[in-house]
Swiss-Prot record:
This is 3-hydroxyacyl-[acyl-carrier-protein] dehydratase FabZ. The keyword tRNA-binding does not apply. GO terms for cellular component: cytoplasm; membrane. Belongs to the thioester dehydratase family. FabZ subfamily. It is an enzyme of class 4 (lyase). The lineage of its organism: Bacteria, Bacillati, Bacillota, Bacilli, Lactobacillales. GO terms for molecular function: (3R)-hydroxyacyl-[acyl-carrier-protein] dehydratase activity. It comes from Lactococcus lactis subsp. lactis (strain IL1403). Its EC number is 4.2.1.59.
Length: 144
């Protein structure tokens, strides 16, 4: 992989997501079919208002969404996919291993392992301080 520093402005050029649903802050490594990105988790995230006010924990499905968005940055930053959308079509073998709380930095790693036409399968994992927080297999459809 090639070490890079793709900032949030460039991420927003690839992804259609915006606050409060943009869950990728920076890309730090990228290759043809692999990406590593960062999500800095703060107490200011809207989901912490209800999940849970006295014990804020990032919902696991949003960790998986952050991983999906990281994979989306990789796919949508390719010139041939400019102007297209990536639709999250499913997730399998998802495991949550560590709670993610305010102050954590999620390191998001996604690797495309299979493609067939507009459908792609990605192996993804999120870590905090080098410890596995979540992992799973994501399926995408490239569209529009």
């Amino acid at each position: 992989m090639t070490e890079v520093n793709i900032n949030v402005t460039e991420i927003m050029e690839a992804l259609p997501h915006r606050y409060p649903f943009l869950l990728v802050d920076r890309v730090i490594d990228i290759a043809e079919d692999e990406i590593t990105a960062i999500k800095n988790v703060t107490i200011n995230e809207e989901f912490f208002q209800g999940h849970f006010p006295q014990y804020p924990v990032m919902p696991g499905v949003l960790i998986m969404e952050a991983l999906a968005q990281a994979a989306g940055v990789l796919e949508l930053s390719k010139p041939e996919n400019k102007g297209k959308l990536v639709f999250y079509a499913g997730m399998d073998n998802v495991k949550y291993k560590k709670q993610v709380t305010p102050g954590d930095q999620l390191v998001l790693h996604a690797k495309f392992i299979k493609r067939r036409g507009p459908i792609a399968v990605v192996e993804a994992e999120a870590t905090v301080d080098g410890k596995l927080a979540a992992k799973g297999t994501l399926t995408f459809a490239l569209g529009r």
